Amino acid sequence: MDNCLAAAALNGVDRRSLQRSARLALEVLERAKRRAVDWHALERPKGCMGVLAREAPHLEKQPAAGPQRVLPGEREERPPTLSASFRTMAEFMDYTSSQCGKYYSSVPEEGGATHVYRYHRGESKLHMCLDIGNGQRKDRKKTSLGPGGSYQISEHAPEASQPAENISKDLYIEVYPGTYSVTVGSNDLTKKTHVVAVDSGQSVDLVFPV
């Protein structure tokens, strides 16, 4: 008998909890309807891949239950389906991730390569900053390069009007951990190659007498 009373009391608590949860859910739903945002009117971010179109009309049609009264501030159009909402959210997250990867890949800085390697492996980039002579000119170049890849740097002969003894080229390359083959030279006779294994956080200095 005591067991039956305990079970009944437990069922009563569960029933009241469910009723309270249902009432709170309806209140949240009403507040969400009043604060509805028309996402289709917002501008689609550039570079975002995917389809933001709503589901086909014939998939959203439901049997009409009779004339419905539209409250002020509400729209007559049907809300997007759950799958369309998640697809839109995934597209915005992909766009945000791509912008984050571009930021950390554009400027060589401490921790930037580690961030890109950890969170944006599919967007591998090699960034090169080139300083020529004593001037302030910098050329930045991007090219795809994964661990174990090979990158060749060709150095062309300087112009005759510029003194040869004043020319120096310092090349800074920020890469992901891996093994790389670096070749420098203006032709097949003067090309020099070094194979370097780079670990995470390691800095390697290479000198090529050209």
Swiss-Prot record:
Main function: Enhances NF-kappa-B transcriptional activity by regulating the nuclear localization of the NF-kappa-B subunit RELA and promoting the phosphorylation of RELA by PRKACA. Regulates the effect of the cAMP-dependent protein kinase signaling pathway on the NF-kappa-B activation cascade.
Location relative to the cell: Nucleus
GO cellular component: nucleoplasm
Superkingdom, natural source: Eukaryota
Name of the molecule in the record: A-kinase-interacting protein 1
Gene Ontology terms: biological process: regulation of non-canonical NF-kappaB signal transduction; substrate adhesion-dependent cell spreading
Cross-referenced PANTHER family: A-KINASE-INTERACTING PROTEIN 1
Region Disordered, annotated ranges: 58-80, 136-162
Species for this entry: Homo sapiens (Human)
InterPro entries: AKIP1
Subunit structure: Interacts with PRKACA and RELA.
Tissues showing expression: Expressed at high levels in adult heart and at lower levels in brain, testis, ovary and skeletal muscle. Up-regulated in some breast cancer cell lines. Isoform 1 and isoform 3 are expressed in fetal brain.
Range of residues in the leader sequence: none
Keywords tagged on the record: Nucleus, Proto-oncogene
Positions in coiled-coil regions: none
